[in-house]
A protein has these predicted regions:
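Short, low-hydrophobicity acidic/polar segments
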Residues: 1-120, 125, 146-167, 179, ...
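Surface-exposed loop/edge segments in extracytoplasmic proteins
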Residues: 16-24, 132-137, 142-146, 182-189
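Edge beta-strands of extracellular beta-sandwich domains
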Residues: 61-67, 183-192
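Short beta-strand elements
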Residues: 76-82, 187-210
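Short, surface-exposed alpha-helix to beta-strand junction/turn motifs within ectodomains of secreted
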Residues: 120-138
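Short, small/hydrophobic-biased targeting/export segments
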Residues: 173-175
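Intrinsically disordered, low-complexity repeat and linker tracts
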Residues: 207-237
Length: 237
């Protein structure tokens, strides 16, 4: 998403301290504030550097993309922020960037071979490079494509997943669709070379046939959007 919701947690680190330099902040929707019970202090330097990341259970410089996103994409939305703040001001402003890419898939058409009661998407999976993402959007680990199970936004109609940046050659199997309980998926191939970039949102439209599913129009690309946090405080010490 492009906004934090109630209970979301971020991790913040003061890079100018060796101790009391980490805190987990939880967002309260009722107060529009970030709260912590941890000790996060300023360093003695006039200007301190802060790194932050979401989810709080991940890390600033690496992230493993979950391959099962059927329960939602929040824990897959790896974001990081870094800023320099003035100790005298006492406030830290953070602007989070999405390090991965968001993909939305819409079922645009069912071919006539399907009866109305057969037009059921049992599962839709999206190909993504796997392994551990690093902050500069490179990948370590096995660096192989794996299937990510998407989140169903609208039953039999709309599906969402978050994947790694990367390049797909033309005619690459980028999706597989399981229809009406079938254990044999329909393959979806790219229509041309496709480069997926960090921080972008991609939209695909599919037509579902008996033997294959196809992308029906050009892929739509837009900015995913960044998230700003203003006036978060570290303690003077």
């Amino acid at each position: 998403g492009i906004a934090f919701t109630d209970g979301d947690k971020i991790r913040v680190q003061n890079m100018n301290r060796a101790k009391k330099n980490l805190a987990t902040y939880a967002y309260s929707e009722s107060t529009s504030k970030w709260n912590t019970s941890d000790a996060l202090y300023w360093g003695v330097q006039p200007t301190n550097t802060f790194n932050a990341w979401y989810p709080a259970t991940s890390a600033y410089d690496s992230f493993t993309i979950p391959t099962d996103q059927t329960a939602g994409t929040d824990t897959a939305d790896w974001m990081t922020a870094t800023t320099s703040a003035n100790r005298a001001n006492g406030a830290v402003n953070l602007s989070f960037n999405h390090n991965l890419a968001k993909v939305t898939i819409t079922i645009d058409k069912w071919e006539n071979e399907y009866l109305e009661n057969e037009r059921v998407i049992s599962s839709l999976e999206l190909s993504s490079l796997s392994g551990v993402m690093s902050y500069n959007s490179t990948l370590s680990g096995d660096n192989q494509a794996k299937w990510v199970k998407t989140y169903t936004k609208d039953a039999n109609k709309s599906f969402v997943a978050i994947i790694a940046p990367g390049t797909y050659a033309s005619a690459t199997n980028i999706m597989q669709v399981y229809v009406n309980g079938s254990t044999t998926p329909l393959a979806v191939k790219t229509r041309s070379n496709l480069t997926v970039e960090a921080g972008k949102a991609y939209s695909f439209k599919l037509a579902i046939g008996k033997d294959l599913a196809t992308i029906t129009s050009s892929v739509t690309v837009g900015d995913w959007g960044d998230v700003d946090l203003d006036n978060q405080n570290a303690t003077q010490q």
